[in-house]
Amino acid sequence: MSQFKRQRINPLPGGRNFSGTASTSLLGPPPGLLTPPVATELSQNARHLQGGEKQRVFTGIVTSLHDYFGVVDEEVFFQLSVVKGRLPQLGEKVLVKAAYNPGQAVPWNAVKVQTLSNQPLLKSPAPPLLHVAALGQKQGILGAQPQLIFQPHRIPPLFPQKPLSLFQTSHTLHLSHLNRFPARGPHGRLDQGRSDDYDSKKRKQRAGGEPWGAKKPRHDLPPYRVHLTPYTVDSPICDFLELQRRYRSLLVPSDFLSVHLSWLSAFPLSQPFSLHHPSRIQVSSEKEAAPDAGAEPITADSDPAYSSKVLLLSSPGLEELYRCCMLFVDDMAEPRETPEHPLKQIKFLLGRKEEEAVLVGGEWSPSLDGLDPQADPQVLVRTAIRCAQAQTGIDLSGCTKWWRFAEFQYLQPGPPRRLQTVVVYLPDVWTIMPTLEEWEALCQQKAAEAAPPTQEAQGETEPTEQAPDALEQAADTSRRNAETPEATTQQETDTDLPEAPPPPLEPAVIARPGCVNLSLHGIVEDRRPKERISFEVMVLAELFLEMLQRDFGYRVYKMLLSLPEKVVSPPEPEKEEAAKEEATKEEEAIKEEVVKEPKDEAQNEGPATESEAPLKEDGLLPKPLSSGGEEEEKPRGEASEDLCEMALDPELLLLRDDGEEEFAGAKLEDSEVRSVASNQSEMEFSSLQDMPKELDPSAVLPLDCLLAFVFFDANWCGYLHRRDLERILLTLGIRLSAEQAKQLVSRVVTQNICQYRSLQYSRQEGLDGGLPEEVLFGNLDLLPPPGKSTKPGAAPTEHKALVSHNGSLINVGSLLQRAEQQDSGRLYLENKIHTLELKLEESHNRFSATEVTNKTLAAEMQELRVRLAEAEETARTAERQKSQLQRLLQELRRRLTPLQLEIQRVVEKADSWVEKEEPAPSN
């Protein structure tokens, strides 16, 4: 066992160099290697699954294979003990479920590996371990079935192989590996036959005349994936173990104690965080020596006991998010490019400290900020304003609200142990946004001050991601100008127009160079982020994502409460029994066909006949048709079960056995629930085309429900599963039962699918207007209150709602609500004005182009008129010449006619004289 441990530790320096097998003695492998020594690795994988690692499911190619382990895509390490089914060969395509742990020497380790059956005939040659891999195949009734595709003595090697060891006859290892992972379920023996039969049919089709290089294009449907956490998001505090359980790939510092989730009290369910206000933050791209944006301002009396940091949010606003969602819904008939997901549009402004993205903020200074930060909440706010001004150049003193988002607590070691507290605030950055007039004046001032860059400088500068909004707006403006050729003609001919492009219409706050704008998707979802991200930024991004999940999930919950329940007619007992008998007969027929087809393939090597059941591209057998319309009379429950069985076929899914226990055992990923194979998504999408509408056409939902659906739908598939909708409701923290969640989800679900893209939406708000409070907060009123608070999801009630001001009582809450409504209306009108300005600019461009065209046509018409006048004058001259010539001809005719008659008479006289002078003939 110690020899195996040395082999695991030593040959992996840097996580890339996978060396060969360890040296064995002349007496054979040691006794410890006769049984697979993978208990330690399996226990680690189990801890990772229960602890908090981030997992991915993807398709890769085996690039290296050794005695006890292999490598996929030169970066994912897997042991042979995690292989499900037949052992893969070198160069084969496999389906991998890998877990990421940056603390290990190899960060990506496979948890499960499965060889894909539908692979082309030409593959990379098998390694020298082919005889060992053959032992790991499933045993049939008559023994092991040899794989005819992989024969190393017929196919020459394409890759240089290492010399084969003389002592590699450890049959006990692979046999024990086979016994420890038997085929589960009733399809254990049938799956291998189905896959082999499918491969043989593919080979015959290709041998029948299809070229080797011809390959059917893969479907472009994205895999089904949702943004969902497997735990309730109402825990007020997270310690070291809780963070490891929630976020598996997170490296927690050794001095970390706990983090208090203050956003739960700052944004209760009754007053959630609003993305209504646009707050755009751009990083200046000026080439100047920028200070370290993560460096804290140096003060003489800085005290590390308290630190204040800010989470600067950059969001396009709710109207822009609605517009993207409506584009996705409107493009059902003609799908275009998929719009950008809301998680990619929500960004955070971060600083840089030693090539690492950190939060903006610094330590508390008693002389500059105040004396007691624990008693006076404005002290740490002053610290945040001072540090943000020094690091980013943004003045946050104009912000009206400062919400406490989280509090980190660290333990400073030493003889006098000290507690360090880091308070993270979320200020309302949208209140310091410049107005349209100020923004246009600022852009014009910068355009006037900046000299036009030369072509060489433009060629040397590389595009950066520091000001994406301005670049996108400039690109949109140039795209609109390029759509009409008349506008281009006007720009070329008109020399009075300014050369500088017009400023973008969306105001933004400008930050100093050196900062970075990272999207929420880039922090949480990226497998390989471009920036090194600090621990606090990672935790805050996860917490912000959980807050959005709770808020959007609560909107879905209120929407489900406002919808009427479905009336499902109970199935008749006679039809139900007939449907069950028909389903049993169909299952038996499928099993018989699967057993008979390999025998038919062995006897008939020719092409498949028309009577054989055709196989689909994904390897599924078609369902035999039922007679007499009994398929239409099946109950809805059995139809949904058949759909689930087809979607969860064991040949397609790698995690079929873990699907039901995924939520109960807390094995889900920390930020997503992923469907394992893309073929499942293709089948589901094809089945969605024939589905009826979920709701009555009269049921119209508000746009915030559409945005909530889009938030959970990570890949814009257009639908959500029943299971995921139930989990969304169960993670809200309102203590719903599983039966309650199931009944609510049944209002919008048809055949286990909620096709939200086909629903109707409008700009209406206030779904919870007629709902009682005890219904809005679930079962919280039935449970004992935890501590002092009666309802964690409810906002704290204030007894002093009236404030005396200038001799009159003012209801502050009502004023704030009215101001919020007016602000919402103002933002809506501003968005409409912005849209009208764009249309007006487009109309102006078209009008200018039309004017240029009119001028050109007028000049051409004037020229044609001149040419027409010249042609008319020429015609009149020709007419006069014609008349003159006609008169001359008539005069000549009149004079020549008598002369002709006179000549005729002279000729006649001459003839008569000649006849008279002829002598008489002699007798």
Swiss-Prot record:
GO terms for molecular function: adenyl-nucleotide exchange factor activity; enzyme binding; enzyme inhibitor activity; RNA binding; RNA polymerase II complex binding; unfolded protein binding. InterPro entries: BURAN (IPR045354), CCAR1/CCAR2 (IPR025224), DBC1/CARP1_inactive_NUDIX_dom (IPR025954), EF-hand-dom_pair (IPR011992), LAIKA (IPR045353), S1-like_RNA-bd_dom (IPR025223). Changing residue 839 to R: No effect on sumoylation. It holds the Pfam family S1-like. Residues 446-458 have a biased composition (Low complexity). The modification Omega-N-methylarginine is found at residue 180. SUPFAM superfamilies: EF-hand. Its main location: nucleus. It is found in: Nucleus; Cytoplasm; Cytoplasm, Cytoskeleton, Spindle. Keywords: Acetylation, Activator, Apoptosis, Biological rhythms, Cell cycle, Coiled coil, Cytoplasm, Cytoskeleton, DNA damage, Isopeptide bond, Metalloenzyme inhibitor, Methylation, mRNA processing, mRNA splicing, Nucleus, Phosphoprotein, Repressor, Transcription, Transcription regulation, Tumor suppressor, Ubl conjugation, Wnt signaling pathway. GO terms for biological process: DNA damage response; mitochondrial fragmentation involved in apoptotic process; mRNA processing; negative regulation of catalytic activity; negative regulation of cell growth; negative regulation of DNA-templated transcription; negative regulation of intrinsic apoptotic signaling pathway in response to DNA damage; negative regulation of proteasomal ubiquitin-dependent protein catabolic process. One of its GO terms (cellular component) is nucleus. Residues 1-35, 178-218, 446-510, 568-643 are annotated as: Disordered. This is Cell cycle and apoptosis regulator protein 2. ATM/ATR-mediated phosphorylation at Thr-454 upon DNA damage promotes binding to SIRT1. Phosphorylation at Thr-454 promotes its sumoylation by switching the binding partner of CCAR2 from SENP1 to PIAS3. Acetylation at Lys-112 and Lys-215 by KAT8 prevents inhibitory binding to SIRT1 and increases its deacetylase activity. There is a cross-link at residue 591 (Glycyl lysine isopeptide (Lys-Gly) (interchain with G-Cter in SUMO2 and SUMO3)). The lineage of its organism: Eukaryota, Metazoa, Chordata, Craniata, Vertebrata. The modification Phosphoserine is found at residues 124, 569, 627, 675, 678, 681, 687, 808. Core component of the DBIRD complex, a multiprotein complex that acts at the interface between core mRNP particles and RNA polymerase II (RNAPII) and integrates transcript elongation with the regulation of alternative splicing: the DBIRD complex affects local transcript elongation rates and alternative splicing of a large set of exons embedded in (A + T)-rich DNA regions. Inhibits SIRT1 deacetylase activity leading to increasing levels of p53/TP53 acetylation and p53-mediated apoptosis. Inhibits SUV39H1 methyltransferase activity. The modification Phosphothreonine is found at residues 35, 454, 484, 897. Residues 610-670 are annotated as: Interaction with MCC. Residues 188-200, 572-602 have a biased composition (Basic and acidic residues).
